[in-house]
Amino acid sequence: MIPDVSHALTWLEAHPKALKGIRRGIERETLRVTADGQLASTGHPESLGAALTHQWITTDFAEALLEFITPVDGDIDHLLTFLRDIHRYTARKLGDERMWPLSMPCFIGAEQDIELAKYGSSNIGRFKTLYREGLKNRYGALMQTISGVHYNFSLPLEFWQAWAGVTDEKSGKEEISAGYFRLIRNYYRFGWVIPYLFGASPAICASFLQGRETALPFERNDKGMCYLPYATSLRLSDLGYTNKSQSNLGITFNDLHTYVAGLKRAIQTPSEEYAALGLKDGDRHLQLNTNVLQIENELYAPIRPKRVTRAGESPSDALLRGGIEYIEVRSLDINPFSPIGVDAVQARFLDLFLIWCVLADAPEMSSDELLCTRKNWNRVILEGRKPGQTIGMGCNDTREPLEKVGKDLFTDLRRVAEVLDGKDSTEYQQVCDELVASFDDPSLTFSARILQAMKEGGIGGVGLELAERYREMLQNEPLELLTEEQLSEEGAASWVRQRELELKDKLSFEEYLALHGGQ
């Protein structure tokens, strides 16, 4: 089941310097809620700066959905402290509001009460809001208020020089991209280990279903909670943030050019379903266009190849220009046991697993096999902790006990951990020891622990209690890396940058839209 990685691990042990200089970044989403857990109806706090142009504090789909973005960092503890500083500063600016500590929202009334994120009057700001209007009309606003954590990861040039024989990023872009696509294919095959260990959405509030049809055999309790007894991450299920209409796009992850061609095809393919929604209601735009994807970012994926874009450049054009620069892992639920939604154990595990995904052999993957991997993920998402659970590989019918596959994987990860730790540390090895125990004892997983708490206190009760505890904790902690002055200066500067964008616009919004894929 697990590919034989022994040769690659032996190579890694002989090249420990190849892993010096791993770079990471984190994006964390969280809903602003009132003291009684209702979605905040206030605008994005002005004191936090302009969501359009702030480097670290922005919004995602909704005006009440905060997103915190760290700079790229070579040190996990430093990275998490930076993220915590942003949380501390924000907690002090939110007045009586709190940050919801769970991926799944709970006390949301009518979908029409969810206000879309606003970014000012510039063309790009209006474009971003219209894109969200399209998402709302296509998939419903409720689904878009589900929050998660994204982990961005890149290996140093020294790794690619030693592993793939490249000299520099420019001349080696094809080889480096091929290495990252190998990582992505292995992620699709084995990444279900992430929701198994860290999924933290085994239950939803009954209100979340709001008349939506579901074939899932939910159990309900007297606290208005629907749950599956062995589920790990309903956020990643069809109930959560996925997109069924995209499953037949045929996008594959075998090489840069076919991947980009698939993406470009999807943003140019008309959709009858979305055409039926209409483009406009009178003068009001309803979506950017009626294609399968309005823009490339609409493609739902548990992992994405990325390159930082230049002004006016699409994500796929950036990839064609420079190859894959880093990958974005998108399968992490909010960690409810951390005030900042993610912790060092998770970050170190992802380092280990993503390195393993690059080292392990990864045969090319057809779009059919990609759909088959979804079945394995679904099994873990909906009943990953079920006693005796088995797991397959791609479209192959043979299955092995999940417990065995997990432990086999950790045998490999332990060797990667020893290389990362070197002689002076045991941090990565400790992560292996802590997490491998979850395969013998599923009650140690995030989903089992949070489900137990939710059965006792209800989802709303648990969410509110944690939100209040973290609010108090973060409000009272001093900043460690940033200063109040730096943060308020960035806030003020972001408003100046937004205003400059608004003054610079020469085109009407209709002209701008026509140039950027609008209809």
Swiss-Prot record:
Pathway: Sulfur metabolism; glutathione biosynthesis; glutathione from L-cysteine and L-glutamate: step 1/2. GO terms for biological process: glutathione biosynthetic process. One of its GO terms (molecular function) is glutamate-cysteine ligase activity. InterPro entries: Gln_synth/guanido_kin_cat_dom, Glu_cys_ligase, Glut_cys_ligase. Its EC number is 6.3.2.2. Keywords: ATP-binding, Glutathione biosynthesis, Ligase, Nucleotide-binding. It catalyses: L-cysteine + L-glutamate + ATP = gamma-L-glutamyl-L-cysteine + ADP + phosphate + H(+). It is an enzyme of class 6 (ligase). GO terms for cellular component: cytosol. Belongs to the glutamate--cysteine ligase type 1 family. Type 1 subfamily. PANTHER family: GLUTAMATE--CYSTEINE LIGASE. This is Glutamate--cysteine ligase.
